[in-house]
Amino acid sequence: MAKCAICDKGAHFGKVVSHSRSQVSGRSNKMWKSNVKSVRIKVNGGTQKMYVCTSCLRDGKVERA
């Protein structure tokens, strides 16, 4: 799974609990994926292709090439 090169944001794991009437009938695994894009950014005067999350792109933490 891709991880943000700026803030190291990646996938999160947990459980999905299904409720049947008044008792818990089962738990299954779930993965929440971050909104990570492959973009060209400016690094040290050149361009480089990296995975960056959309929150870092929106906040202006990187400059697109």
From Swiss-Prot:
Record-level Gene Ontology MF annotations: structural constituent of ribosome
Cell membrane found in the keyword field: no
An individual GO BP term: translation
Cellular component GO terms held in the UniProt record: ribonucleoprotein complex; ribosome
Ribosomal protein keyword on record: yes
One Pfam family recorded for the sequence: Ribosomal_L28
Keywords: Ribonucleoprotein, Ribosomal protein
Family the entry assigns: Belongs to the bacterial ribosomal protein bL28 family.
Database matches in HAMAP family: Ribosomal_bL28
Protein name, entry field: Large ribosomal subunit protein bL28
